[in-house]
A protein has these predicted regions:
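Regulatory, non-catalytic segments
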Residues: 1-301
Length: 301
C-alpha cells in the first residue's frame, strides 16, 4: 500500500457541435464517502486547447494539489477508493461533452496505477452499464453537474491486451510540432508483430506544438506484457518534418473496440519527461525511430 504522488488526467472532448466549453473542469477524489474531499482540483487555462471541440487534453496533478491530510505528507491510497470516489465536474453553465476519459496515478513507491477509464461517453448504447450521452453543465437543463468515471484495475503480466491507449503531449518549443505521421510497432519475444499501426489524422490538433493527443490503437494479435522484452515497442515517424514530444504514455486494454468496457489496464510505457530526442527521417534532425522503454514496475502476480 502506498499513497499517490502524481495523478494524470487525460480526456478527449467530443467532436459534435457545441461539445467544447469555456467553463472550468474539476476533478474530485473522495475516500470511501468521507466528509471531506482529498482532492478538489479545478484546472486553469493552459497552452493546450482546453476542452475545445474534438481536442484532447492531458493534465498533471501533484502532491501539492491535494488537500491537507491528518498525516503530514499523505495524499490517498488507491486501495481506499470505491466506485464513486472519483468524480469529474464543471464550474459553469457552458455545457461540455467529454468523449473519452482516462485517469491514472503514480504511487510514491513508483507503481503506476490506472484509476478510471471511459472509452466512449457519447455512444448510442451503454454496454454493461457504461455511461452514454454524458454532458456536464451547472444548467440542469443542459447537463449534469458531475459524473463518476468507471473504475478500472491494474492488469498484471498475464492480462491479454486487445487494444492500446496512447497519450502524449508535444513540446512547447519552436518547430516541435510536425505534419508527419507516427507509427507504433510492437513485436513479441517470439518474433510475432502484434501491433503495426500508423496513427491517422483525427479531429485533434495532431502532434502540434504544446498540444495533447489521446489515441486508441488496434491490436493485430492479442498479447500479454509477459510476452514483451526491452526492445519490443518501437515508435517511428514517417517523414522528415521533425517532431519533439514532451511526454508519452502507453497502456494496454483488456477489451477490443466495441466490446465490454475494459476491466484491466496494463501500463506499458511511462515517460512523463521525454528524453529520447527528436524524431525525423532526416538524420540531420533526429532519428527515424526509437525503442520505447518497457515499464518494469508492473505488479507481477
Amino acid at each position: 500500500m502506498s499513497d499517490l504522488k502524481t495523478v494524470w488526467f487525460g480526456m478527449l472532448t467530443d467532436d459534435s457541435d457545441d461539445s467544447g466549453t469555456d467553463s472550468s473542469i474539476v476533478l474530485i477524489i473522495n475516500v470511501r464517502g468521507g466528509r471531506f474531499d482529498v482532492l478538489h482540483r479545478t484546472f486553469p487555462d493552459t497552452n493546450q486547447n482546453d476542452q475545445e471541440q474534438g481536442q484532447a487534453n492531458l493534465y498533471e496533478i501533484t502532491e501539492d494539489d491535494f488537500e491537507p491530510q491528518p498525516f503530514v505528507g499523505s495524499t490517498v491510497d488507491p486501495q481506499d477508493l470505491n466506485a464513486s470516489s472519483i468524480r469529474i465536474g464543471i464550474r459553469g453553465d457552458d455545457m461540455w461533452r467529454p468523449k473519452s476519459i482516462f485517469i491514472w496515478g503514480e504511487q510514491k513507491d513508483g507503481l503506476i496505477v490506472p484509476l478510471a477509464l471511459n472509452t466512449e461517453l457519447q455512444g448510442d448504447v451503454g454496454i454493461a452499464g457504461q455511461l452514454v450521452g454524458v454532458a456536464l453543465s451547472t444548467d440542469s437543463g443542459e447537463g449534469k453537474l458531475s459524473f463518476a468515471p468507471a473504475r478500472v484495475q491494474l492488469g498484471d503480466q498475464t492480462v491479454v491486451i486487445k487494444r492500446l491507449l496512447m497519450l502524449l503531449t508535444t513540446a512547447d518549443v519552436d518547430n516541435a510540432g510536425t505534419d508527419g505521421d507516427i507509427a507504433l510497432q510492437i513485436t513479441a519475444t517470439d518474433g510475432r508483430v502484434v501491433v503495426d499501426h500508423v496513427f491517422p489524422d483525427t479531429s485533434q490538433d495532431d502532434l502540434e506544438r504544446a498540444q495533447a493527443n489521446l489515441y486508441f490503437a488496434p491490436v493485430d494479435i492479442p498479447f500479454t506484457r509477459g510476452e514483451l522484452n526491452a526492445d519490443s515497442i518501437r515508435l517511428s515517424i514517417k517523414g522528415d518534418d521533425a517532431w519533439v514530444p514532451a511526454r508519452l504514455f502507453l497502456f494496454g486494454l483488456s477489451e477490443p473496440e466495441g466490446g465490454q468496457p475494459p476491466e484491466f489496464v496494463v501500463p506499458l510505457v511511462h515517460l512523463p519527461t521525454w528524453s529520447l530526442g527528436t524524431l525525423s527521417t532526416d538524420e540531420r534532425e533526429g532519428q527515424g525511430s526509437v525503442v520505447l522503454p518497457l515499464l518494469d514496475n508492473i505488479v507481477l502476480l
